[in-house]
Amino acid sequence: MSFLASVGVTNVDLMYVGMPRVPQEGEEIFSQDFRVLLGGGAPGTAVNAARLGIPTRLATYLGSDLFSGFARAQFEQNGVSPYNLAAEGETGIPVNVTSAMLTPGDRTFATYCKPTAITDELLERVYTMSKGAKLVQMQEGFLPVY
């Protein structure tokens, strides 16, 4: 069976929409709207391909935290089969979390990103997951797989 394989980190974007400006340090400004969205290149490719009816696998890092739960639910709703790259028993938040403030003239970001080591064992797991795919998208760091 043909499928698309995508490999990379998942982002969860916290979008503060309709900010009049970026707040100064120590200041609080309220946004007109707020959204939580799935982000990241690999997840975006996987979700859009799945929406087109293409069988899709995504190798990414997921944990037992709130943000990973949100990402899992989004993958499930969009027909993406995630393969978890997080180590068994790993703690913390393995997905990137970005706060984006959108103002009339531009946007500003603050991102949390947990560093992850790309080991030979991890590369082997990615190879096993993506073997047989007709198209593979790899985030930087995973290119040695091919």
Predicted region positions:
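Short loop/turn microsegments at loop-to-beta-strand junctions
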Residues: F34, N96-V97
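Glycine-rich phosphate/adenosyl-contacting loop at the front of the ribokinase-like
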Residues: M1-Y61, S68-F70, Q77, A133, ...
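Ribokinase/PfkB-type carbohydrate-kinase core domain
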Residues: M1-N11, R57, Y61, A73-G89, ...
